[in-house]
């Protein structure tokens, strides 16, 4: 299908224009180059066509724009985005009427999407961790009958990799539940406040999951707010272990230790996940579970760690105050802190190599 010459000219003008006059807006509306109350514009980013449109607050990939247009049953934009180069098979992810399905067939769409295609779309949308992307991903994938059991194995693998130590995935876990937890965790990690509010309005049982995410992503200020002011609490020993499953989490490890968390348990958890920064920070705080830690390291084949923990060269750091409980004070003190015991093991390793 070819575009009318006047539309071709208008598209070129839209692509090239940075600022459009009110008169031009009227023309754009008349010609269908208008979406969600703003002008529709094209731009290029690293050789990829992007749609500049205001409703997400950011540019979106042309293929993703097609998925949205199909979900909205927007016939004219489906055709336009396809003419501009959008892969018509992506439409299969959001088709919700037989009329749209027939249109997409006419434009060359297959009958079904491959698992790899679905997973590729998911990762493409989630590439930029913003509130708009998280909410969009939720709108497209949540309770989507076009997906059925597609890409479940790949998605489980992705969540397990990105949230290693934070979540245990069981075979009985529902896909929708895993998706909500993944999106919420990403919203907490990247401080996407609109997405957090959006998900909390839809799902009312996220308080404990949020606390776990704050521990995992080293968010001490929000953790303090939830624990002391909102009174969302779990066992402090579980908290310090969870903080230890992701490396370089001194803020939340210290915070939980100040609350009474077992620093040796944190040390052993850090060893289990091979989190070097956490291990030696725990020793700085007084952790001394060397024999148990060495046994775990040997069992897992962590040879360097097993050898290191057998050395009699470590001790707690006397310069570390052990009674700070205010997140501002903890953050300020640890901002430029260099682990005493990590420095010792690096120096030892350098000398023997």
Curated annotation (Swiss-Prot):
Role noted for this protein? Plays a role in virus cell tropism, and may be required for efficient virus replication in macrophages.
TM segment ranges: none
Tree of life domain: Viruses
What is this protein called in UniProt?
Protein MGF 360-13L
Q: Which InterPro entries does the entry link to?
A: ASFV_MGF360
Source lineage: Viruses, Varidnaviria, Bamfordvirae, Nucleocytoviricota, Pokkesviricetes
Name the Pfam families on file.
Answer: ASFV_360
Q: What family does this belong to?
A: Belongs to the asfivirus MGF 360 family.
Which GO BP terms, alphabetically? taxis
